[in-house]
Amino acid sequence: MYRFAPSPTGDMHIGNLRAAIFNYICSLQDKSGFILRIEDTDKERNIEGKEKDILEILSKFGIKPEQIYIQSENLKFHRQLASKLLIDKKAFACFCTEEELEAKKQKAKEQGVAYRYDGTCERLSDAEVLNCEKPFVIRMKKPTRTMSFTDAIKGELSFEPDAVDSFVIMRADKTPTYNFACAVDDMLEGVTFVIRGEDHVSNTPKQDLIREGLGYTGKMNYAHLPILLNIEGKKMSKRENESSVKWLFEQGFLPEAIANYLILLGNKTPTEIFTIEDAVKWFDITKISRSPARFDVKKLEQINREHIKLASKERIKEIFGVDESKVELVKFYTQESSLVPEIKAKVEAIYSPKIAPDEYKNEFEIIKKAARNLKPCESFDEFKKELMGATNLKGKNFFMPLRALLTNDLHGPELSELYPLIKDDLAKILI
């Protein structure tokens, strides 16, 4: 069972989307199932409506979870299982105040050593714990052995006990920390394979330790994806437009193209242009590069252009809001643009009232009047010949205003290539 577990705290990052796509593809390959879990326990950072945004984005990519879980609905289980760990002496109550902990952290910093919890409260007797009325958190006891796991991308990874430390699993307000809620939920929901970003590598031994402490014996597999870099080779910040899936949609990138590019990054694929359905046939999570990959919007534009060219008539009609007669015109304009709004604007300009260029106003009106009176012409050569004869214009004085009349622009593709696509609509265009 695979899962995607985003938090509703902001716009979806392309790194998160990449993880969702990889999890979904792998679930289709081994038919083990795919679930969505909304990790909404951080009430202060949650943004209303983001759960809906997550579902809508996944839907655009054709990602269909078999089950949707809301993490906060598992709170009673989190509390019950934290209590079990206390009873079983796998965890302990910690009464250390923030001020006390901060002083210890500062001392470690001054000594030039990494801070580790010193076990103060772990040494308290049961009587001392029961008689203490101070607020407390629950800490998982530091492991007594090296914690190891095999990562499908990074290979064998090991963490010494001090690196895992005695970490907090329940806050003083009786809400779970990320690692505890995540570990428990994966266990309860039957997750067996976790594909996520490499920023979670250090969380993995903690989550494994929690499940071990609860007596869970199910095997968990992991694959931690290298981070995505911007074009300058720096880690992509959430403040960068390109990192937002919503922004990419707004710019006119198709879900098909975005998915294609995210699968392509740091991967050796049999072809450059493909769909998620294609990738299911050959994708191998173990072949993902261990090195970070650069996200290049220009490359994504090229891929977007190819997906527009390959799109079915129905898909073009859906994306661009055009009827069937304009489908080939849309694809024709991919030679000039790769983004939906740009192509849409060029097509709409052809069917909009035309504006005469200042330097060709007189010629524009002459050509417009003559063109309206021409008999239908099958080819551009015939159309050009008839129109030149009727207007006595030639060269720039003919072609520039003619282009403006047909496209509302003085620059663009070859009119001889455009004409076959619009000849049947000349009556609508010559306005």
From Swiss-Prot:
Reactions listed under catalytic activity: tRNA(Glu) + L-glutamate + ATP = L-glutamyl-tRNA(Glu) + AMP + diphosphate
Residues where ATP binds: 238
Entry's Gene Ontology molecular function annotations: ATP binding; glutamate-tRNA ligase activity; tRNA binding
Positions of transmembrane segments: none
Cited Gene3D superfamilies: 1.10.10.350, HUPs
Biological process according to GO: glutamyl-tRNA aminoacylation
Keywords, ordered alphabetically: Aminoacyl-tRNA synthetase, ATP-binding, Cytoplasm, Ligase, Nucleotide-binding, Protein biosynthesis
InterPro entries, A to Z: aa-tRNA-synth_I_cd-bd, aa-tRNA-synth_I_codon-bd_sub2, aa-tRNA-synth_I_CS, aa_tRNA-synth_I_cd-bd_sf, Glu-tRNA-ligase_bac/mito, Glu/Gln-tRNA-synth, Glu/Gln-tRNA-synth_Ib_cat-dom, GluQ/Sye
Motif ('HIGH' region): 6-16
Major enzyme class: ligase
GO cellular component: cytosol
Major localization class: cytoplasm
Record motif 'KMSKS' region, residues: 235-239
Catalytic activity, EC: 6.1.1.17
Pfam families hit by this protein: Anticodon_2 (PF19269), tRNA-synt_1c (PF00749)
Keyword set includes Cytoplasm: yes
Location of this chain's protein in the cell: Cytoplasm
Family the UniProt entry places it in: Belongs to the class-I aminoacyl-tRNA synthetase family. Glutamate--tRNA ligase type 1 subfamily.
Subunit structure of this chain's protein: Monomer.
Function: Catalyzes the attachment of glutamate to tRNA(Glu) in a two-step reaction: glutamate is first activated by ATP to form Glu-AMP and then transferred to the acceptor end of tRNA(Glu).
Record's protein name: Glutamate--tRNA ligase 1
Source taxonomy: Bacteria, Pseudomonadati, Campylobacterota, Epsilonproteobacteria, Campylobacterales
